[in-house]
From Swiss-Prot:
Function statement: Catalyzes the reductive methylation of 2'-deoxyuridine-5'-monophosphate (dUMP) to 2'-deoxythymidine-5'-monophosphate (dTMP) while utilizing 5,10-methylenetetrahydrofolate (mTHF) as the methyl donor and reductant in the reaction, yielding dihydrofolate (DHF) as a by-product. This enzymatic reaction provides an intracellular de novo source of dTMP, an essential precursor for DNA biosynthesis.
Name the record gives this protein: Thymidylate synthase
GO annotation, biological process: dTMP biosynthetic process; dTTP biosynthetic process; methylation
Biological pathway: Pyrimidine metabolism; dTTP biosynthesis
Main location: cytoplasm
Gene3D superfamilies registered for this protein in UniProt: Thymidylate synthase/dCMP hydroxymethylase domain
Active site (record annotation): 146
Keyword entries, A-Z: Cytoplasm, Methyltransferase, Nucleotide biosynthesis, Transferase
Catalyzed reactions: dUMP + (6R)-5,10-methylene-5,6,7,8-tetrahydrofolate = 7,8-dihydrofolate + dTMP
Provenance organism: Methylorubrum extorquens (strain CM4 / NCIMB 13688)
């Protein structure tokens, strides 16, 4: 995970001070890319402990097309609570856009199902793209999509994924995002009969909040440990059939967690 540490180091050394929507203030760089070969291990940050339950359940929640936090809360995940309304609703956020993007003439598009079908039909397609950035729905979303567009790529029997993230909370959010999309890539690879390839993470505004700088220095003082391994239940052949117990991370031995406030 040196690539992640390099991102943190770059923001600290090159970042410009910017104001932001939350009023917290940030150090920010514009344009950065990381690449992880998933054959080398599962890219889970080891210099602080991450809450695996939240990462896995959030991805399953996205794939269900759900936009209410009830499922998350039932499974001990609170990462979306600050943005939910009194009924637990978040508006047409990620799950809605991934699974039922509204068409202007009526009806919806299931982008994830389309990708699965297109990989089977035409693995060389350059249209294997999912977007969560729907300008018509932004005003009704509790939080505009930060990780807003991703593309799959098939070559030599390997499935790779590139994510474009317009806004990236480098200390709290990015470790979750890396793990989530690496997991999605591995799950997609299994159900399409491919091997997991690279996960490429491309950023627009990558930033550290002003109240995360001390924690970032602490994390950078720690030596990364060997990456864990992901084990998926080989019996699962449909992406939408994956359950929490089908996803196991083995050999994760991180440094202790580092607490930091969430900018809302």
């Amino acid at each position: 995970m040196r690539a992640y540490h390099d991102l943190l180091t770059r923001i600290l050394s090159e970042g410009v001070r910017k104001e932001d929507r939350t009023g917290t203030g940030t150090l920010s760089v514009f344009g950065h890319q990381m690449r992880f070969d998933l054959a080398d291990g599962f890219p889970l940050v080891t210099t602080k402990q991450l809450h695996l339950r939240s990462i896995i359940h959030e991805l399953l929640w996205f794939l269900k097309g759900d936009t209410n936090v009830a499922y998350l809360k039932e499974n001990g995940v609170t990462i979306w609570d600050e943005w939910a309304d009194a009924n637990g609703d978040l508006g047409p956020v990620y799950g809605k856009q991934w699974r039922s993007w509204a068409k202007p003439e009526g009806g919806t598009v299931d982008q994830i199902a389309w990708i699965l079908d297109e990989i089977a039909r035409n693995p060389d397609s350059r249209r294997l793209i999912v977007s969560a950035w729907n300008p018509a729905d932004l005003d009704r979303m509790a939080l505009a999509p930060c990780h807003c567009l991703f593309q799959f790529y098939v070559a030599d029997g390997r499935l790779s994924c590139q994510l474009y993230q317009r806004s990236a909370d480098a200390f709290l959010g990015v470790p979750f995002n890396i793990a989530s999309y690496a997991l999605l890539t591995a799950m997609m690879a299994q159900v399409t009969g491919l091997k997991a390839g690279d996960f490429v993470h491309t950023f627009g505004d990558a930033h550290l909040y002003a109240n995360h700088l001390e924690q970032t220095h602490l994390q950078l003082s720690r030596e990364p440990r060997p990456l864990p391994r992901l084990r998926l239940n080989p019996e699962v052949r449909s992406l939408f059939d994956f359950r929490f117990e089908d996803i196991v991370i083995e050999g994760y031995e991180p440094h202790p967690a580092i607490k930091a406030p969430v900018a809302v």
